Structures are given as structure tokens and as C-alpha cells.
């Protein structure tokens, strides 16, 4: 599941301080819902998946707890989803090339969408 917000394209160059301080994202409830779909990965075009700051009553970065810790679902951040959104692509083959590192908690990846 990939989410396109347009936030990075609209904010990063014009206001990098704002881009680094806040992001639109999913709620705690949405994290649980998405986990129930049992995807291999959930990602977005923002530097985090959950909203920062979180909505009132939500826990910050709860998406990481639910998706990664509880369900083993990968989280993909700062994905370049603009072209997919611009062309109205909703289904595609997703190919992920990753570096061969052992014990890392973060990874630079080389994702490709084929449609």
C-alpha cells in the first residue's frame, strides 16, 4: 500500500523547516486498519507514515508499533509517488532492490513501479 500526499513535493524546497517538523499521515486507527489488510509493506511520500504531530488522543509513531513490531509489515518512507499519482496508476508491480546489509534498522532502497 502506497499513499501519495503531495506534501514533500509541495513543501520540501519551499519550506524545509516546516517539511522536517510536521507531516500529514495516518492515524492510529488507520494503522490498525492497514495492518488488518496484511500487506507486505505500507509507505508514503513523506518522511514518516504517521501524522506529526499526531491528532489529539493518538500516540506518535504508533504506526511503527502496529505495522513493524506487531505485524512485521515493512514501512517505506519518502517514496517518489508523484508520477504514479499524476498518471492515475493504482495497481502496478512493485520491485524493491535493497543493499545487502546485515543488522541494519534502516535501508536505502531502489524501488521500481512497473505498469
Enumerate the language-model features and the residues they cover.
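Active-/binding-site microenvironments in catalytic and ligand-binding cores
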Residues: 2-115
Amino acid at each position: 500500500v502506497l499513499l501519495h500526499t503531495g506534501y514533500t513535493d509541495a513543501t520540501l524546497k519551499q519550506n524545509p523547516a516546516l517539511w522536517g517538523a510536521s507531516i500529514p499521515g495516518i492515524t492510529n486507527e488507520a494503522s490498525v486498519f492497514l495492518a488488518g489488510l496484511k500487506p507486505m509493506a505500507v509507505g508514503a511520500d513523506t518522511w514518516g507514515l504517521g501524522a506529526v504531530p499526531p491528532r489529539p488522543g493518538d500516540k506518535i509513531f504508533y504506526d511503527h508499533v502496529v505495522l513493524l513490531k506487531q505485524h512485521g509489515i515493512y514501512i517505506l518512507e519518502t517514496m517518489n509517488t508523484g508520477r504514479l499519482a499524476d498518471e492515475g496508476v493504482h495497481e502496478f508491480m512493485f520491485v524493491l532492490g535493497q543493499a545487502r546489509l546485515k543488522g541494519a534498522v534502516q535501508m536505502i532502497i531502489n524501488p521500481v513501479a512497473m505498469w
